[in-house]
């Protein structure tokens, strides 16, 4: 299931971030790719230990921790520090599946990649191509969001980034280990959480709200990996 999260950053904030990233020194993106991915990865990346990457990564995590939809959809237990990439001049990333486990640089911390995320910083009309294409149950789905918007998708997904033939596509990408490993279980919990919130708005104080909230937490208790 693909989940779009609007306006993690406003358009103005995304533009400021993009301007700072445009002035940074980029390196070959294959430095963080696995053996198979490196054969189809053609882009540039901000070094993981670059001060700007660390500063913006912290800012992204702060925003996401306050975003109700993100927290409900991802149920994050661990989040890999955000990375930043850039595509232009025909650069692309062919079909691949992300590594199942990532080690946080400079630590022994391991993150199981239950979910992947891309946060766009370039406006769609400033570049051609660059669509994130994610294969799911219903076939390939193409994603190209406004600057400041984010997409979540299962880490198990086969996916690619189409060649950028005009302009530049700058984005952040990262992975999460969820409290709930299985995508279908997370989706069910998200649907229930959204329904409870709507019921709270439409019929505040209804006794069913307490019952449904209890069911939600009992399912989470059954499925959570803590």
From Swiss-Prot:
A biological process from GO: intracellular iron ion homeostasis
Keyword Metal-binding assigned: yes
Keyword annotations: Dioxygenase, Iron, Metal-binding, Oxidoreductase, Vitamin C
Cofactor, how bound (note): Binds 1 Fe(2+) ion per subunit.
Domain Fe2OG dioxygenase per the UniProt entry, residue ranges: 78-178
PROSITE patterns on file: FE2OG_OXY
Binding residues for 2-oxoglutarate: 169
Superkingdom assignment: Bacteria
Protein name (record): PKHD-type hydroxylase Bpet2704
